[in-house]
Every structure is written in structure tokens, then in C-alpha cells.
Amino acid sequence: LPPVPGGKPLTRPWIVVERQGRKIGIVGLVNEETPSLASPCKEAVFGPAETALREAVASLRAQGVNIVIALTHLGLNVDCELAGRVDGVDVFVGGHTHSLLSNTNPKAVGPYPIVKHSPSGEPVLVVTAASSCKLLGHIAIDFNDAGIAQRWNGEPIVLDGRNVTVPPDAKLSARLD
């Protein structure tokens, strides 16, 4: 979200975390239809995701970040399109279309992950894990020193309740059903 006129941004557009001595940027993106799908505050302004992503990647790279993850609510097709159009993003973790990606589930719409290539030819991994907290996305990625994914392995984990130790919240369960 861009700043309100004369003000500060309503949210942080990205964060930088450090893991194993590496700076990792995580960028949040939602679709421009959010105001008609949700009830954001009236000050919120939603712009083009691609523009926001390009600006975020440039800023993150200037801060020495060489692994960028886009956490999106744009839909699988948009994530895949952006993966092929925007340099500097390594992984898209997406939602919105409730698409199932899997290497083992015959109902999947594609493999987990989908591998696209950035304009500069680097691999970009796209993952999503359906909807309603029925699956938990899981992927392990080996990056080289330049932050380029070299190897990866993953598969969504079915959350079937077999090891549940906390009773379900009735109100939340009703909303998910």
C-alpha cells in the first residue's frame, strides 16, 4: 500500500529477515480488486502489483538482499506471469485462486513448485497450497552465494487433524465450512 497523502505507509511493503547469515526480503502483494473483495480502510490505496514488486525488488537489492520471496494474494496465473516479467524474485508463495499444486495429488493443476524463468533466465519457483488451511505448503530450497535457487524439493502437507491436541474453535470452523 502506498502512503496516504502526506502520511506514512499504512503497512510495511516488505520486511528483511536474516537467516544463516543471509538477508532475505519478503514482499507482500495483494490484487487491485481487494477493495471490492474485502473491507479495507478508506485511506488504503491499491496500485498495480507489478509496479510495487519492481520497486520493492530494487530497494531490497540496494539493501544487500539477494533472496526475495513474494508473498501474494494475486492468483496462480498472475504469480506465474510476474515470475516471467520481473527480475530479482526467487519465490512466489501465492494465494487467491485456491489452486492445488502437487507432485503426488492427481487433482493438482500443476507440479509443486511450478518453475518459471525470470527475464534474465534465473529459475523462479511458484508455490500455492489450495485453501481453507487444509494443506500447509512446504519447500526446501538451496541457494548459491548469488541467491539463485539451485535445488529444491517440496510438497504440500495435508493437515488432516490426526495429531490435533487443541479442540477446534467452533466459530472459525463454521466460517471455514
What are these regions (language model features)?
Residues 1-167, 171:
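Acidic, metal/ion-coordinating pockets
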Residues 174:
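C-terminal glycine/acidic-rich active-site capping loop/insertion
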